[in-house]
Regions:
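Blade-level signature of beta-propeller repeat domains, shared across WD40, Kelch, NHL, RCC1
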Residues: 237-274
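Beta-rich, blade/repeat-based domains predominating
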Residues: 12-32, 40, 44-49, 65-84, ...
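Short loop/turn segments immediately following the C-termini of beta-strands
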Residues: 36-39, 45, 78, 88-94, ...
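Outer membrane beta-barrel transmembrane domains
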Residues: 189, 197-203, 208, 215-219, ...
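A short loop-to-beta-strand structural motif that recurs across blades of beta-propeller domains
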Residues: 48-51, 97-100, 158-161, 209, ...
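Short loop/turn segments immediately following beta-strands, especially the blade-tip
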Residues: 1, 101-112, 162-170, 221-223, ...
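Beta-propeller domains
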Residues: 94-99, 103, 115-177, 185, ...
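Surface-exposed loop and turn segments in beta-propeller and other repeat-based domains
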Residues: 2-18, 52-69, 113-132, 165-184, ...
Length: 274
């Protein structure tokens, strides 16, 4: 049965126009983080920020330092503190896509940055796109067990790994390519499956294949293709992904179909990853 959506956050009348992105995450303390990449009247990207919104839908803060147009994020949440990795499209330079690490202190009343934000990866391709505004580093997935951050770089059409993501003091460049083959068509969202594999959505902005439209692709962290399925018969439908374990051997995947403006929920058996 279809669900009903309600508006959680909307800026007050007269506020500057926002450009909310897929840099969206919820902290365990109830605060919502969301990227904002506004444009001017000519469609030119302006300075972006990361907004902090409380559980009642009220903005209580924002961050801009070391953030150039936040496009997506991943969170390692310890309740009273968190590490947040933010991918940035940094418009203006076609090899300037980056990932910034923020260390946050979380209290009942707000969120603040500890220490200086650190750019831990850079050099990802960024390019304008008529449908998406811009293509660049997008989905992020963090493995706390190995301190590795995985990056879905849309314009590069590849998945990268960045080592020592939580501890490094400087940039690793782009990191290492772990997955890049004909199953990728502009990867966007990136999440872990319960078995440890990685799952990405193909936005079809790069090397689209009409025989493989709107695909969700699973692969191991060592770069072995596992499987794929499509969520829309047309290209450009696969967008955001959420996933959770709902039984001992069952994963529930929620996928945004951007063509139909729907959220599709699928239950799948969980196989063993690498």
């Amino acid at each position: 049965m279809p669900g009903n959506a309600i508006t959680f956050f909307q800026p007050p009348p007269g506020s500057p126009t926002l450009g909310l992105t897929t840099a969206l995450g919820v902290l365990r303390a109830g605060f919502v983080l969301v990227g904002n990449v506004p444009t001017d009247s000519n469609g030119v990207i302006q300075q972006g920020s990361l907004l902090v919104i409380d559980r009642n839908g009220k903005q209580v803060g924002s961050f801009t330092n070391q953030l150039g147009d936040p496009w997506d994020l991943a969170i390692d949440d310890e309740f009273d503190h968190a590490t947040v990795f933010v991918s940035n499209v940094n418009s203006g330079n076609n090899k300037n896509g980056s990932v910034t690490r923020l260390n946050l202190r979380i209290s009942p009343t707000g969120v603040s940055v500890i220490d200086t934000p650190t750019v831990i990866a850079n050099g990802y391709t960024v390019e304008p796109n008529g449908a998406a505004l811009v293509l660049g580093p997008t989905g992020l997935a963090y493995d706390a067990n190995t301190d590795t951050l995985y990056v879905a770089s849309t314009a590069d059409n590849a998945i990268f790994s960045v080592p020592r993501a939580a501890g490094r003091t400087g940039s690793a460049g782009t990191g290492d390519v772990i997955f890049q083959d004909d199953h990728l068509h502009g990867p966007l969202a990136l999440v872990f499956a319960p078995n440890g594999d990685l799952i990405t959505s193909n936005g079809d902005a790069v090397k689209p294949d009409p025989t493989q439209p709107s695909e969700i692709v699973e692969f191991t962290k060592s770069g072995k293709f596992v499987g794929q399925f499509n969520v829309d018969a047309g290209t450009g439908g696969a967008f955001g992904i959420g996933i959770a374990l709902v039984g001992q051997d069952t994963a529930r995947i929620a996928v945004v179909d951007d063509n139909a403006n729907d959220i599709i929920v699928i239950d799948q058996n969980v196989g063993q990853g690498d």
